[in-house]
Amino acid sequence: MSDPLPSSFEDNPQFEEETGLQKFRRRLKEEPLIPLGCAATCYALYRAYRSMKAGDSVEMNRMFRARIYAQAFTLVAVVAGGMYFKTERQQRREFEKAVEERKSQEKRDAWLRELEIRDQEDRGWRERHAAMEAAANEAAKKAAVKPTAEQDAARSVIEAADQKSLGVLDAVMELMSRQK
């Protein structure tokens, strides 16, 4: 179903599965201005808070303006980075989709192998069971086909005794007379 990954993904070590920390570091290296803008915003808020506690309203207003500028810088960095790294992100999405397809195909193949193994085990069990049943039927047929002379004589005496309603003594006497 899924084709092998294109060669552009194979040679590039950047396109590998990554942990959360690796992803954070990669994003930090790709767009260093965004964390810088966030840090500037936090610093401006911290300075505004200290100015407010000290009662310096001029410095506080100046820091609030600096916070607005830092937030604007962060937004510009986000938009510019998004435009700059658009193709790379699209390639990364394609790669992640290909990796997901490969994983799902591997899971499906493993599931099919497991089903085949179970099917083979089931067939083997059925064959063994059928062979045992056939052997038992064959043994029963052999036992039924070849009655021994004693069994035949005893059977005929019993059948004759049942038909004539003879007593036990008469049946024994008849059996003794046949054996002589």
UniProtKB/Swiss-Prot annotation:
Key words of the record: Coiled coil, Membrane, Mitochondrion, Transmembrane, Transmembrane helix
Signal peptide limits: none
Gene3D superfamilies: 6.10.140.1320
Subcellular location per the Swiss-Prot or TrEMBL entry: Mitochondrion membrane
InterPro entries membership: Hypoxia_induced_domain, RCF1
GO terms of biological process kind: mitochondrial respirasome assembly
Disulfide linkage: none
Membrane-topology descriptor: Multi-pass membrane protein
Tagged with keyword rRNA-binding: no
Main localization (coarse): mitochondrion
Coiled-coil residue windows: 88-108
Domain HIG1 span(s) in chain numbering: 5-96
Subunit details: Associates with the respiratory chain complex III/complex IV supercomplex.
Protein's job: Cytochrome c oxidase subunit which plays a role in assembly of respiratory supercomplexes.
Assigned protein family: Belongs to the RCF1 family.
Protein name per UniProt: Respiratory supercomplex factor 1, mitochondrial
